[in-house]
Design a protein with these regions (language model features):
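Thiamine diphosphate
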Residues: 232, 253-276, 280-281, 495-503
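Glycine-rich loop/linker segments at domain edges
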Residues: 6, 12-18, 82-85, 161-208, ...
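Helix-loop-helix junctions that connect adjacent transmembrane helices in secondary transporters/permeases
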Residues: 147-238, 403-481, 683-704
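Flexible, low-hydrophobicity surface segments
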Residues: 1-162, 188, 274
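Catalytic phosphate/nucleotide-handling subdomain of diverse soluble enzymes
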Residues: 462-524, 539
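C-terminal catalytic domains of large/alpha subunits in multi-subunit enzymes
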Residues: 67-68, 239-244, 274-279, 308, ...
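Extended active-site and interfacial segments that coordinate phosphate-rich ligands
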Residues: 14-15, 122-129, 133-135, 225, ...
């Protein structure tokens, strides 16, 4: 192939490295008013009285909006970027009299510059009726204190939600008699695992600017993964027609799922709609840390049964998830904790998966790369590693005996057939890469330090089956170059480049001959958005279909110009020529000009794609750590990974995606953590407290690919974006066990915990 499975440079690479104006604040109108949010200091309270009279007198202040400017009985909305009807409940108002976490919005302050807005915010006086908060998610379900007692709370989808029980969702499913199967097992691992909430920590914070156009329509330029969902979110929040809203995506400085929620879009949209003036809201780093959309805290109770020979016979999983003050992505993330972990073990005769998602008075959680699978895989993979130790078996060996194979039916993965799978080859590759036989389980370096290894495996999905929609428009321009118009959002992943490669392969042209534009709700074809690992698999297939149809149209018009039939010509990317006489030909430019001069053959095609299945990508990872027994410091000195993502459309981009995901997983395993004090105040409000690993903190990260061929994907491709974050958690936890003999069931695993465990083991 000429363009697919080739390592092309990203289309926007030079723009970014040369500092061209591509981000939201670069493109915002010069006369934007500044918007700031006055936030609650209480985790649960009612606003009794708010006095903005003095604040409004500050020179330059345009407006201050409070709950009194919002109908408290109006229909609520969700900020979640999901296909309608959303699984996430409608539980928000633009400004609610009832504030539900420290950082919830009390007032919107608008002024000519940041200085006057900051001054006005200090002059706002608020009296609260402080209520007792729900801060422990273990006690939230059926707690007499309700996070959402209001009657206009609404759940559009049957997800088991009940605001009068603090339940955002409940579900139960299974296959076979799990209790009977576990009763017959020789060994049962029964453990509880806990993963804390953690931040996406993208470099560009949440930000949006808005203005009214000449036609009286609200224009929104937002750093978002979900332009079409944002349009619906804003329409629902402001109670205005979607036809009055246009949403545009600039270049995004990272998202990782955080921007699958309309965190910043609603408030400036509200201001511009009210004032008819342009404005912008840019979150500070503190706001992005304390009032955003982090990963869900989860607790997972795993019972895993096996024979004495190591065959996993049954898995029983209960997941309790903390959605925080609002329910964005709560019902959907929790499902992946089981449906993307249990199916890895193809010989299991039974499974049960029960989940509850509860409201608390913590910051609202949301989408983060891995989307619940990360938490569930930490639990299930850690249980399998403990099973291997109990049976004195090698962790690689026990997985080789149990893994799902190509062609298997996966009851825990919605009964789907495993259409493509190279998991067995990934296991062998990583075993070789990390030199497992010579390093497992631990080596003493003789200086108070040891080196140990651990491993884990993972699966994810490729889009949301039967729901996600990807679309593309392709057209030939008048001198023979192509425009590819998409609704998917490139947030640094390089999907503009990847999708162009797919089109170029079909059209047999150079990658530079395709320009990519998106995403804009007025001009782009509908796309669900860049989330759920859907872009390459779903939108990429739409691009492939679109390019195939356009190729046919080029041949049809070329045949007209050559005065023959369509089946008598061929197109080589540059010329349409007669099969019988290749010297008789017309160039693509001539065909393009002809389409604009007296011919009725359109050279602009739009195609849409949705998939009834979501074929899983697979990954195996192994970590080698160096552990200092005196200080408890753990450093990952080597990480070996092998991914099956089907055909890698662009190996360079898939490699850096994998490296970045591994780095995030290492952070979640060792340092990243959101904690609260006794009153519900978040403790990590900057990168001084919230520690993300830098490149200098990590040793080698090595990535290889073992490609299966997915027949339903473009050129055999599956997804890559999310599966890559999942393996470091169980791998590092197991390596620490191999180093010091203590298992940890809660993340992150800190140096203090490790040092104390070493001391206890002496």
């Amino acid at each position: 192939m000429k363009n697919v499975n080739k390592a092309f440079r990203k289309k926007d690479a030079m723009q970014l490295v040369t500092g061209k104006p591509v981000y939201m604040d670069d493109l915002a109108p010069a006369d934007c008013l500044i918007v700031k949010l006055y936030r609650s200091p209480h985790a649960n309270a009612m606003v009794e009285r708010i006095d903005t009279s003095v604040a409004k007198k500050v020179p330059g202040i345009e407006a201050i909006f409070t709950w009194e400017d919002v109908d408290q009985n109006a229909r609520r909305y969700t900020q979640a970027g999901q296909t309608y009807p959303e699984a996430s409940p409608y539980d928000r108002l633009v400004i609610d009299r009832h504030v539900r976490f420290v950082g919830d919005v009390v007032a919107i302050v608008v002024g000519k510059d940041e200085k006057c807005v900051e001054k006005a915010m200090k002059l706002i006086k608020v009296e609260y009726q402080v209520l007792e908060p729900v801060l422990d998610f273990h006690t939230a379900k059926d707690n007499p204190i309700l996070v959402h007692p209001e009657d206009n709370w609404e759940s559009l989808s049957p997800v088991g939600a009940d605001n009068k029980r603090n339940l955002c969702a409940h579900d139960a499913c299974g296959d076979g008699d799990i209790d009977a199967v576990l009763a017959k097992c020789d060994v049962v691992i029964d453990r509880v695992y806990h993963t804390k909430a953690c931040q996406q920590a993208m470099m560009e914070t949440f930000r949006t600017c808005c203005w009214m156009d000449l036609y009286g329509r609200l224009n929104i330029l937002s750093s978002t993964q979900i332009v079409f969902h944002t349009r619906r979110n804003v329409a629902n929040a402001l109670h205005i027609p979607k036809s009055m809203i246009r949403v545009i995506k600039p270049r995004i400085g990272g998202g990782f799922g955080a921007k699958q929620t309309a965190v910043s879009a609603i408030y400036p949209a509200f201001v511009t709609w009210k004032t008819k003036k342009s404005c912008k809201l840019i979150f500070t780093r503190e706001e992005s840390q304390t009032a955003s959309s982090p990963r869900h805290e989860m607790e997972m109770h795993v019972r895993l049964g096996a024979t004495k020979d190591g065959i996993v016979k049954g898995i029983d999983l209960y997941t309790l998830s903390n959605t925080g003050a609002y329910g964005e992505h709560g019902p959907t993330t929790v499902g992946l904790s089981g449906h993307k972990s249990i199916p890895l073990y193809g010989k299991a005769e039974a499974f049960r998966f029960v989940s509850d998602v509860v409201y608390t008075n913590h910051m609202s959680a949301g989408a983060y790369r891995g989307y619940g699978a990360t938490q569930g895989l930490f639990a299930v993979e850690s249980a399998v590693n403990e099973l291997a130790a109990r049976l004195h078996m090698d962790p690689f060996k026990i997985r080789e005996m149990n893994i799902v194979k190509e062609g298997d039916v996966m009851p825990a993965y919605y009964g789907a057939v495993n259409t493509s799978c190279a998991l067995d080859r990934c296991l062998k590759k990583v075993h070789e890469m990390i030199d497992w036989d010579n390093k497992y389980p631990v080596r003493d370096l003789g200086n108070g330090k040891v080196r140990a290894v651990g491993m884990g495996m993972a699966m994810q999905g490729s889009g949301i089956s039967g729901m996600d929609v990807g679309s593309a428009t392709l057209k030939v321009n008048d001198d023979g170059f192509y425009s590819l118009i998409i609704g998917a959002a490139d947030m640094g992943t390089g999907c503009d480049t990847t999708l162009a490669q797919i089109a170029a392969e079909v059209l047999d042209c150079d990658l530079d001959n395709i320009t990519v534009f998106g995403a804009d709700t007025d001009t782009s074809p509908y796309d669900s958005g860049s989330y759920a690992s859907s872009t390459t698999y779903v939108t990429g297939k739409a691009v492939e279909k679109c390019a195939l149809r356009l190729r046919g149209q080029i041949c049809k018009l070329g045949a007209e110009l050559l005065q023959t039939t369509e089946d008598a010509v061929d197109f080589d990317g540059k010329f349409v020529s007669l099969n019988a006489d290749p010297e008789k030909k017309v160039s693509l430019s001539e065909v393009a000009f002809a389409s604009q001069f007296g011919h009725m053959v359109p050279l602009e095609i739009t195609e849409t794609h949705t998939s009834p299945i979501s074929p899983p990508p697979y990954m195996v990872g192994a970590a080698e750590i160096e552990l200092d027994k005196e200080t408890g410091e753990v450093k990952v000195v080597d990480y070996a990974a092998c991914v099956d993502c089907g055909t890698p459309i662009n190996p360079n981009l898939t490699r850096v995606q994998t490296e970045g995901g591994i780095l995030q997983g290492i952070g979640m395993a060792l340092t990243e953590n959101i904690t609260y004090d006794a009153k519900g105040w978040p403790m990590e409000n900057s990168f001084m407290q919230y520690k993300i690993p830098a490149r200098v903190d990590i040793g080698h990260i090595r990535v290889e690919f073992e490609s299966s061929y997915e027949p339903n994907g473009p050129f055999g491709a599956k997804s890559i974006g999310e599966v890559v974050i999942n393996t470091p958690l169980p791998a590092i936890a197991d390596a620490i066990y191999n180093a010091i003999g203590t298992r940890f069931y809660e993340l992150p695993i800190t140096p203090e915990q490790v040092a104390m465990a070493v001391e206890e083991n002496r």
